[in-house]
């Protein structure tokens, strides 16, 4: 039995000796490595915050004091010392420990976040609430790993700076991606003095006395203050924070637990918001991660614990996009690539190697990415903005007002669209086809296979008077499904028997729809499967196909509310097509973490479930009654 097994809550940390705490840190790293090697997850960020997290929980009293993690993937250590060590082997498994903070798991988790740059706003609100209610509680926000490249973090800092009474401690986890390395001992000594309340009292006294001296007093104080600030600014990167009016402690070695505890205790005693700047190394304590040049094992696939070698993985959708965008870049000198701190994950790294001058990583700034793309389009370029589907939500206003309103030719490529699975509710890209339906002029494509991804990407970048979107899911693509016929701009994938059922298969659900068709054909039901390719706007040819069939069924890997099926039904209503309609999509709920296949089964987006429902509907129609839950044009 290890020491970690005896830690049921953060309170158990406070009685441990230095030697025991070192042992505990070692056990935590070992468990992190072994678990992520099998389950996958975020390893590098968590290896880098072991001592930092232990220090936070020894100095503060969670859950009375609230700890908010920005980009919650760095909360694994927090979970381990907050009672979840025994169940950590279920990390990212259905019904197991989430890869992000989860209110359902523990009272120590308050924010279920995986979107970056939000923690400071949560913390600002919490701290203000406790101040108003007269509660003596601290709020600790841990932010870093690039999250300070997001504008929302600076909006929060701008407001935090004027909330002088808020008991808010902001721990900047600087792993080399946001700030310069630590400077030295003098900076630490000066910042220790700077945040000492006694120093503040003395400074106020000196200010009052000097200002009372006629003529020279105010000037003397300003000179003294400028000298002190100038010396500190020369030694440590706190100038920007102090210019905002925030107290600053650091830099401090984030892997030195005792030093972290000392500065956190100083910050806790100060009556107001404080920045604690901790220098850490991503992947710390695991040599393969520290030597991994790309991202220090940020989120590796399954790997060998001894060597760090990742196990072979198959081809994914991202690889197809990555190859095709390079081909397009060679043919189109006006093509530029933009991403928001996701160069490798979205597959733009290959484009960057070929065309570095035409590739832009804007940091965690999706809003800026969209509007900058509009500017590039106005300047004669064609930008391709590659993001995860869930992160486009953050830039909706910019897509609508900055890109679409100005009829800019910008292509958005949405990776990890639809159900993503293991990363939980906030990573599912299940809203894009709903929110984008309201954007005038925007065209949206959903490829069913690799060949269609290449085809539709080429078509998208040819549009220079409106935004286009190409979206595809996470994981491995299916084999190419060739069309048997064409209807307008849509592909007919299956045409069997009589015109009983028209199945409209959106994007990656094409494979599912073909399977459904085989099951229906085996039961004597005639079926046509159509892939719209471009799902917005609705192709008039699909309206005519719907008019010819007895039942229309739409299948999409997107929310049912406001999605492609809902818009198709609305279009049929407007065209006077009264064919009964069945919509299959993602219900209007947040989906917990599990494998994609398990989630699709849970929500009924499997060939078996869909075919069964269609058989039931056709039976009702054959008997001369329309099922109550089949949507019907009126």
Curated annotation (Swiss-Prot):
Q: Which cofactor does it need?
A: Mg(2+); thiamine diphosphate
What Pfam families would the database entry show? DXP_synthase_N (PF13292), Transket_pyr (PF02779), Transketolase_C (PF02780)
Q: Which UniProt keywords apply?
A: Isoprene biosynthesis, Magnesium, Metal-binding, Thiamine biosynthesis, Thiamine pyrophosphate, Transferase
- Look up the EC number in the record and give it: 2.2.1.7
For biological process, the GO terms are: 1-deoxy-D-xylulose 5-phosphate biosynthetic process; isopentenyl diphosphate biosynthetic process, methylerythritol 4-phosphate pathway; terpenoid biosynthetic process; thiamine biosynthetic process
Instruction: Recite the UniProt cofactor note for this protein.
Output: Binds 1 Mg(2+) ion per subunit. Binds 1 thiamine pyrophosphate per subunit.
Q: Which reaction does it catalyse?
A: D-glyceraldehyde 3-phosphate + pyruvate + H(+) = 1-deoxy-D-xylulose 5-phosphate + CO2
Residues noted as binding Mg(2+) in the record, renumbered to the chain: 145, 175
InterPro entries xrefs: Dxylulose-5-P_synthase, THDP-binding, Transketo_C/PFOR_II, Transketolase-like_Pyr-bd, Transketolase_BS, Transketolase_C
The record's section on SMART domains has: Transket_pyr (SM00861)
Pathway listed for it is: Metabolic intermediate biosynthesis; 1-deoxy-D-xylulose 5-phosphate biosynthesis; 1-deoxy-D-xylulose 5-phosphate from D-glyceraldehyde 3-phosphate and pyruvate: step 1/1
PROSITE patterns xrefs: TRANSKETOLASE_2 (PS00802)
Q: Which GO terms describe its molecular function?
A: 1-deoxy-D-xylulose-5-phosphate synthase activity; magnesium ion binding; thiamine pyrophosphate binding
- UniProt record similarity statement: Belongs to the transketolase family. DXPS subfamily.
| Function, in words | Catalyzes the acyloin condensation reaction between C atoms 2 and 3 of pyruvate and glyceraldehyde 3-phosphate to yield 1-deoxy-D-xylulose-5-phosphate (DXP).
What NCBIfam families does the record tag this protein with? dxs, PRK05444.2-2
Please identify the protein, giving its name as recorded.
Answer: 1-deoxy-D-xylulose-5-phosphate synthase
Gene name of this polypeptide: dxs
């Amino acid at each position: 039995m290890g020491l970690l097994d005896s830690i049921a809550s953060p309170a158990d940390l406070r009685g441990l000796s230095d030697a025991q705490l070192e042992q505990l840190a070692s056990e935590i790293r070992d468990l992190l490595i072994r678990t992520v090697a099998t389950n996958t997850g975020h390893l590098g960020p968590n290896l880098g915050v072991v001592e930092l997290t232990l220090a936070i929980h020894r100095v503060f009293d969670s859950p009375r004091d609230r700890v908010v993690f920005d980009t919650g993937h760095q909360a694994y250590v927090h979970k381990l010392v907050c009672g979840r060590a025994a169940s950590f082997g279920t990390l990212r498994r259905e019904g197991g420990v989430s890869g992000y903070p989860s209110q359902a798991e523990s009272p120590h988790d308050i924010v279920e976040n995986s979107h970056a740059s939000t923690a400071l706003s949560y913390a600002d609100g919490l701290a203000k609430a406790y101040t108003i209610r007269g509660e003596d509680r601290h709020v600790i926000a841990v932010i870093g790993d690039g999250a300070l490249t997001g504008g929302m973090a600076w909006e929060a800092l701008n407001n935090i700076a004027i909330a002088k009474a808020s008991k808010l401690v902001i721990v900047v986890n600087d792993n080399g991606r946001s700030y310069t390395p630590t400077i030295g001992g003098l900076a630490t000594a000066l910042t220790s003095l700077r945040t000492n309340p006694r120093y503040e009292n003395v400074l106020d006294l000196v200010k009052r006395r000097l200002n009372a001296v006629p003529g020279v007093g105010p000037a003397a104080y300003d000179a003294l203050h400028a000298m002190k600030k100038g010396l500190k600014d020369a030694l440590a990167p706190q100038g920007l924070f102090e210019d905002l009016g925030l107290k600053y402690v650091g830099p401090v070695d984030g892997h030195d637990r005792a030093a972290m505890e000392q500065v956190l205790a100083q910050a806790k005693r100060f009556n107001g918001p404080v920045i604690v700047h901790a220098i850490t190394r991503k992947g710390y304590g695991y040599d393969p991660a520290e030597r991994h040049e790309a991202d220090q094992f940020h989120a590796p696939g399954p790997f060998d614990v001894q060597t760090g070698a990742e196990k072979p993985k198959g081809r994914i959708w991202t690889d197809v996009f990555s190859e095709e965008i390079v081909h397009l870049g060679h043919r189109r000198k006006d093509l530029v690539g933009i991403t928001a701190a996701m160069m490798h994950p979205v597959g733009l790294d290959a484009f960057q190697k070929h065309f570095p001058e035409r590739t832009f990583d804007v940091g965690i700034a999706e809003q800026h990415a969209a509007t900058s793309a509009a500017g590039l389009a106005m300047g004669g370029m064609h930008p391709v903005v590659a993001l995860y589907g869930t992160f486009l939500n953050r830039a909706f206003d910019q897509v609508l007002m900055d890109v679409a309103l100005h009829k800019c030719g910008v292509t958005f490529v949405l990776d990890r669209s639809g159900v993503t699975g293991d990363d939980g509710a906030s990573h599912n890209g299940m809203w894009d086809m709903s929110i984008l339906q309201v954007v005038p002029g925007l065209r949206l494509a959903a490829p069913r296979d690799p060949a269609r991804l290449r085809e539709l990407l080429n078509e998208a970048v040819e549009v220079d008077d409106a935004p286009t979107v190409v979206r595809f899911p996470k994981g491995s693509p299916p084999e190419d499904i060739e069309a048997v016929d064409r209807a307008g701009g849509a592909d007919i994938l299956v045409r069997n028997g009589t015109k009983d059922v028209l199945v409209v298969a959106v994007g990656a659900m094409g494979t599912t729809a073909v399977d459904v068709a085989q099951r229906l054909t085996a039961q004597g039901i005639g079926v046509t499967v159509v892939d719209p390719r471009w799902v917005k706007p609705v192709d008039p040819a699909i309206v005519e196909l719907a008019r010819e069939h007895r039942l229309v069924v739409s299948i999409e890997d997107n929310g049912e509310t406001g999605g492609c099926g809902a818009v198709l039904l609305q279009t049929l209503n407007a065209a006077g097509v009264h064919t009964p309609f069945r919509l299959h999509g993602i219900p209007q709920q947040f989906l917990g973490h599990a494998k994609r296949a398990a989630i699709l089964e849970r929500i009924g987006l499997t060939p078996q479930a869909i075919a069964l429902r269609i058989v039931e509907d056709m039976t009702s129609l054959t008997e001369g009654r329309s099922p109550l839950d089949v949507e019907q044009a009126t």
